[in-house]
Every structure is written in structure tokens, then in C-alpha cells.
């Protein structure tokens, strides 16, 4: 097993010291800690990533600045085109669904009418059958069964 080395302290910006430690042999990585440098240091601890961005303001006339602006402008254009295309696709889908909905509603009306016609035909046929059948009295049925049994 290896031992942890002693923490090394480096003076930072705004009176903040950064304490660096080395990880032991298990491969764990430790993150640098931000600690105020002294009792009168004042201010809040700022992560190193934020410090580096604010420490060097970019010259607006530099090539790097112009390249960044150009890349940013292209990214903005691309994002806006993508957003516009998505809105158009959504609108097209809405219109397709509206048309499909209208077709389905028309089909429902047609099938409802067809069902009504078929019900009417069925009921009419059932009434015609009932009118054509003569009621059989129980006396006639008993007499017929006696005659057939001889």
C-alpha cells in the first residue's frame, strides 16, 4: 500500500489557497479544495474553471474573438432553422391528424346509418314472421298428440 502524500498548498486568486492532494494507489481521484487563504482573505471561494474565464477578457478585434462569434452565429442559425423545421413538421402532422379525424367521423356517420337501416330491416322481418304465424291453442296440440299416438 502506498501512503498519501502531504497536501500541497498553492496561493490562488482573491486570497484563496487551493489545497492539492494525491490519491492513493486505489485509483480514487480527489478534487482540489478551495480554502480561504487567511483570516482577512474575504470574498467567496471561486472554482478554478470560473476564475480562468473571467481572468482574461477577450479583445473584440482579435481573430479568436471573431472566430468564436462566427461559430456562435452559425450555431444560432442552425438552432433557429432546426426549431423552425420542427414547428413546420408539427403543423404538418396536426393537419394530417385533422384530415384523418374528419375521414373517421364520416365513416362513423356512414356506419351508424347502415346499422340503423339493418336494425329496421331486422325488426320489419321479425314482425312479418310474427304476423304469418298463427297461434296454436293448447287444446289443438293435445288432440293432435292423441291422434298421432294411436
UniProtKB/Swiss-Prot annotation:
Work out whether the entry's keyword set contains Transcription. Answer: yes
| Location relative to the cell | Nucleus
Q: Which InterPro entries match?
A: bZIP, bZIP_sf, C/EBP
- Biased-composition ranges, Low complexity, are 28-37
Leucine-zipper: annotated span: 97-118
Its predominant location is nucleus
Q: Which GO terms describe its cellular component?
A: nucleus; RNA polymerase II transcription regulator complex
GO terms of biological process kind: B cell differentiation; DNA-templated transcription; enucleate erythrocyte differentiation; immune response; liver development; mRNA metabolic process; natural killer cell mediated cytotoxicity; negative regulation of DNA-binding transcription factor activity
Q: Which controlled-vocabulary keywords does the entry list?
A: Activator, DNA-binding, Isopeptide bond, Nucleus, Transcription, Transcription regulation, Ubl conjugation
* Region feature Basic motif, mapped onto this chain: 66-93
Q: Per its UniProt entry, which superkingdom is the organism in?
A: Eukaryota
- Residues involved in crosslink (Glycyl lysine isopeptide (Lys-Gly) (interchain with G-Cter in SUMO2))? 3
Give the span(s) annotated as Disordered.
27-94
Q: In what ranges is there compositional bias, type Basic and acidic residues?
A: 56-72
Does the entry feature the keyword Acetylation, yes or no? no
What task does this protein carry out? Transcription factor that binds to the promoter and the enhancer regions of target genes. Binds to the promoter and the enhancer of the alpha-1-fetoprotein gene. Binds to the enhancer element PRE-I (positive regulatory element-I) of the IL-4 gene. Binds to the promoter and the enhancer of the immunoglobulin heavy chain. Binds to GPE1, a cis-acting element in the G-CSF gene promoter.
PANTHER family from the xrefs? Answer: CCAAT/ENHANCER BINDING PROTEIN, CCAAT_ENHANCER-BINDING PROTEIN GAMMA
This chain belongs to the protein called: CCAAT/enhancer-binding protein gamma
* Species per Swiss-Prot/TrEMBL record: Rattus norvegicus
What gene is this protein translated from?
A: Cebpg
Amino acid at each position: 500500500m502506498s501512503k498519501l502524500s502531504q497536501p500541497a498548498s498553492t496561493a490562488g486568486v482573491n486570497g484563496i489557497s487551493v489545497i492539492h492532494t494525491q490519491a492513493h494507489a486505489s485509483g480514487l481521484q480527489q478534487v482540489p479544495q478551495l480554502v480561504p487563504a487567511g483570516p482577512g482573505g474575504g470574498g467567496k471561494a471561486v472554482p478554478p474553471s470560473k476564475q480562468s474565464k473571467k481572468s482574461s477578457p477577450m479583445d473584440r478585434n482579435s481573430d479568436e474573438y471573431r472566430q468564436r462569434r462566427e461559430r456562435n452565429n452559425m450555431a444560432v442559425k442552425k438552432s433557429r432553422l432546426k426549431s423552425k423545421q420542427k414547428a413546420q413538421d408539427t403543423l404538418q402532422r396536426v393537419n394530417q391528424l385533422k384530415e384523418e379525424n374528419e375521414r373517421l367521423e364520416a365513416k362513423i356517420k356512414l356506419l351508424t346509418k347502415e346499422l340503423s337501416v339493418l336494425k329496421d330491416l331486422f325488426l320489419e322481418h321479425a314482425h312479418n314472421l310474427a304476423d304469418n304465424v298463427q297461434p296454436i291453442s293448447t287444446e289443438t296440440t293435445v288432440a293432435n298428440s292423441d291422434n298421432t299416438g294411436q
